[in-house]
Amino acid sequence: MLKQWFNVGKIVNTHGVKGEVRVISRTDFPEERYKPGNALYLFLEGKDEPVQVTVSAHRLHKQFHLLQFKEVETLTEAEKLKNALIKVPEDQLSQLAEDEYYFHEIIGCDVFSEDGDLIGKVKEILTPGANDVWVVARPGKKDALIPYIDAVVKEINVADKTIKIHIMEGLLDE
């Protein structure tokens, strides 16, 4: 079976002269994911196989995460990593609490009303602030924006890829 990879960030530039790289993070758990000693996998442009690296340092700088890898000690080496996607295999995903889900578990789920009517399919998840917002593609209609809050999301079945929601007034207005 093919190994499934999950995107946790992208190297967008270098930082300084000692091989640090500037990362736009795509993980909900940067402190855990980028902890020194952790293995990450870099998918470089034009390369078929990922390159394994080990985090030696992590810090925040403005809106970026700065990472140092044990295998990268110079600016010249770090330059070669620009635009690389940082991924981890499925077996490195953290265990979540019972009512928490990874984006890949939610995207693709069919969304139903409490009455059992199909509303559409989750195609994207937005993270604007206080709570996530699920973008639900509806056949022949405008996408619906569903807030991930207890008052709306009533049931999630990851195994069946189904979600049941309470339709509050105005939620699905055209």
UniProtKB/Swiss-Prot annotation:
An annotated GO cellular component: ribosome
Location of the protein in the cell: Cytoplasm
An annotated Gene Ontology molecular function: ribosome binding
Major localization class: cytoplasm
Top-level taxon of the source organism: Bacteria
Key words of the record: Chaperone, Cytoplasm, Ribosome biogenesis, rRNA processing
Location of the PRC barrel domain: 98-171
Biological process (GO), any one: rRNA processing
Protein task: An accessory protein needed during the final step in the assembly of 30S ribosomal subunit, possibly for assembly of the head region. Essential for efficient processing of 16S rRNA. May be needed both before and after RbfA during the maturation of 16S rRNA. It has affinity for free ribosomal 30S subunits but not for 70S ribosomes.
Subunit structure of this chain's protein: Binds ribosomal protein uS19.
Family to which this protein belongs: Belongs to the RimM family.
Alphabetical list of PANTHER family matching this protein: RIBOSOME MATURATION FACTOR RIMM
Domain notes: The PRC barrel domain binds ribosomal protein uS19.
Name of this protein: Ribosome maturation factor RimM
Organism of this sequence: Bacillus licheniformis (strain ATCC 14580 / DSM 13 / JCM 2505 / CCUG 7422 / NBRC 12200 / NCIMB 9375 / NCTC 10341 / NRRL NRS-1264 / Gibson 46)
Gene: rimM
